[in-house]
């Protein structure tokens, strides 16, 4: 069966919290996964040790297990791909648009 790296939603209404899990592709979103390899909190929070007041979203991930599952053929969903690229495991799937190069035209 095909394995997926995907998000399983927990938390409450208007306060989502996700587990990054390895599960079979055809199982339900919150069914029992094969392994939980990390968590993702999409609600921006202030860092307790940062005095600038910047907000950040919390991503905790077992990098060695994520690399293992990708190595054995687990396919990340688009959202998990984006999170793994933020951590530095995968290259970004969608690159930011580059500014257009101005073409010099001869008159």
UniProtKB/Swiss-Prot annotation:
Its main location: mitochondrion. One of its GO terms (biological process) is translation. It is found in: Mitochondrion. PROSITE patterns: RIBOSOMAL_S16. Keywords: Mitochondrion, Ribonucleoprotein, Ribosomal protein. PANTHER family: 30S RIBOSOMAL PROTEIN S16 (PTHR12919), SMALL RIBOSOMAL SUBUNIT PROTEIN BS16M (PTHR12919:SF20). Belongs to the bacterial ribosomal protein bS16 family. This is Small ribosomal subunit protein bS16m.
């Amino acid at each position: 069966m095909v394995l997926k790296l995907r998000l399983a939603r927990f938390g409450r209404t208007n306060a989502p919290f996700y587990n990054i899990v390895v599960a079979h592709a055809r199982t339900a979103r919150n069914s029992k996964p094969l392994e939980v390899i990390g968590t993702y909190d999409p609600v921006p929070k202030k860092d307790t040790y940062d005095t600038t007041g910047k907000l950040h979203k919390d991503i905790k991930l077992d990098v060695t297990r994520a690399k293992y599952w990708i190595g054995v053929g687990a396919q990340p969903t688009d959202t998990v791909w984006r999170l793994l690229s933020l951590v530095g495991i995968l290259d970004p799937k969608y690159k930011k648009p580059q500014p257009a190069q101005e073409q010099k035209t001869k008159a």
